[in-house]
Amino acid sequence: MPVVSFSRREMERLWRSLSEEELTDLLDFTKMNLESFGEEVGFEVTSDRMDLVTLEGIVRCLKGISNEELGLPKYRVRRKAFEVRVGEGVAKVRPYVVAALVRDVDLRTEESLVALIEAQEKIHDTLGRKRRRVAIGLHDFSKVKPPIIYDARRAEEVHFVPLGEYAEMSAKEILEQTEKGKIYSHLIANPENLVPLIMDSREEVLSMPPIINSELTRLTPGVRDIFIDVTGTDLKAIWYALEIISSALAERGGEISTLDILYPDGRNIETPRHEPEEMEVDLDFIRSILGLNLSEDDVVMQLLRARLDAECSDGKVRVLIPGYRSDFLHPIDVAEEVSITLGLNKIGYELPKNVMTVGRPHPVEKVSRKVRTVMIGLGYQEVLNYIMTSRASLFHAVGREEREVVEISNPVSESYSVLRDALFPGLLAFLANNTHVRYPQKVFEIGDVVLIDERLENKTRDERRVAAAYADDSVGFEDIYSHLKVLFENLSYRIELEPRKERPFIEGRCASVLREGEEVGVIGEIDPEVLLNLGITVPVAIFEVALKVPGKEPLT
């Protein structure tokens, strides 16, 4: 879980002085733990509460728990200060941007700026997936002339002074010579050598996301007006990050100005969102989940202490949720919030009655452990991907033919809208994200896929599989087959291969894997065209096999 630390003096300036014991007692009613207490105060926060990686978010939360401020924070908001115009050039490089302006912020101390940068970098590393998914730019607005332009230019044609430098450099030089450029340049690598840029109306470069800001808009203590840009590959994620940062600055007295983001396809969105979302939950549901006969007033008070707005009538609890909270997906989350602010120690427990069982590993788990040991022995590194993914990632990105898969009826994000029916697309995505790492690269995953099966009552079944991908400049079918053969020999099974024609494999270099005459998987070399589309410049061979075949026992 993320750990953040801030100046205790700055925390006291934002709120009040607390002893270590007082702070620990307050944190018992939050999703935070105290990691350290001295000149710096360290907090461990849960990954679903990214608003708590900001010092301002922590103070906002503690004010609620101590009953000093209840309900939704009231921020000053001015709508549509100016436009951010998105060019067509960024579509294939870094397609999404949102932005805000926050005026009259109190950032008079060095510690306040350090706290802001600490939160920014923690969001980059977690929610932002090391800046791939989300990158935040913070700028001194007094140096900016709106409207703002977000577009791409050829790297050799762009020149500006990068943050922390004294001389003008080309974007190409920044990517090749600066520390940040060397670390993050792979995130915007593309055949056209384009770089995304945040510019003002004079075409002065403010930022080259996700690499580095310009020295022109450096933040210094005493800065009053801050322009925030957030770019990335996931619109929902960057919107969430903007809500976190803009609300944190509003906690320092700032006035949030929303901006119009004009996309080239005609979309016009206003950011940040200044209206809370609403969720309605049955009061009896909360009572049953917590096992407590709470009154309407009890439930409403706990939600107000959680810095939410709430009211209850006719057995329904109506909750208003601010934009910087993305952890409310289901009524169970409202019940959880009540339990946290109420105090988990107030919820009793009892041991199950008449339960006399002896546990043992499931056969599929036993074989999974054995497979893991063999794969590690073959020099492979294990990766873990989500079972939820998108159609684009599962089919389009890796050149697979579309087929019927289990879809989520109301997905929170397009990135998690279907259940995977194969493991290897996730491995290819992993390789595509790590082209900057030295080869050979050998990765594997053991996990479940979900398949349509009309014979079953629920029309689906889970299947445990292992998939492996081997990437190197001279890797071929024979290399990956030798590893598959070793794996099955260690499982005391013989396998046979049968020619197969299927995308995204090279024709003639793909086969079905048969165990006792029944197909259990696939092996082959990936089509170079698919690899190039993913940005992978070396050959890749993969296999994927089931560890449990319907009607047969697990491989043991």
Swiss-Prot record:
It is an enzyme of class 6 (ligase). Mg(2+) binds at residues 327, 333, 336-337. Its EC number is 6.1.1.20. It is found in: Cytoplasm. Pfam families: B5, tRNA_synthFbeta. The keyword Metal-binding applies. Its cofactor is Mg(2+). This is Phenylalanine--tRNA ligase beta subunit. It comes from Korarchaeum cryptofilum (strain OPF8). The gene is pheT.
